[in-house]
Amino acid sequence: MNDIHFLRRLGGIGALGLSCCIVPAGAAGGGFDAANIGAAPAGWTCGSTGGGSPRWTVEADATSGEHAPVLKQSGRGKFPWCVKKDTSLADGWVQVRFKPLSGKEDQAGGLVWRWKNGDNYYVARANALENNVSLYYTEAGSRKTLKYVDAPVAAGSWHTLRVEFVGTRIAVFLDGKRYIDHQDDHISGAGAVGVWTKADSVTAFTDFTYAASAR
């Protein structure tokens, strides 16, 4: 699929890298409800692929922009995830702002899409300890690497991660720059979208948005 066709399928946004951090009209999602401070976000389901004790809570954060609450993962698990229950996208895009706060083993922030359950989904993540962006698929609970690319990921700073996906085409952006453009057919059909971390990563998320592609 060429760039122009990919762009049209996404409704005039994306794969050419011109609008990575712009949220167009019609996008769903947004911030997290202050009524859920100290608790898991309403309308989301959270867990960890491979076990562990993840802790997903909505927290106050004065650095998030307009003092909006953030979703924070402060526990530990092999691959913690938290997905929005009412989402089902086969093709489209998903975007989030994230801040790596701490972690000795990892300082990762990621996105999941075509999420069928805790053992089957795609994930793209950025890691402040490794300074890279990577793309994986998870099947039957086993994570497989598709691509790694070096990228600057400063700890303690906000970054914007975005994934665009149509058919077998996947594009991954960090802070407005496309780092990965890959073809893969392991996981197809509609699934949920959400956020992801790894190991002991303590990570904050805000401005979670998504949309299905134009038909």
Model-inferred region functions:
Residues 173-194:
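Short, solvent-exposed beta-strand-to-loop segments that form ligand-recognition rims
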Residues 26-49, 206:
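Extracellular carbohydrate-recognition regions
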Residues 73-135, 139:
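Secretory/extracellular carbohydrate-interaction modules
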Residues 11-22:
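Bacterial N-terminal signal peptides
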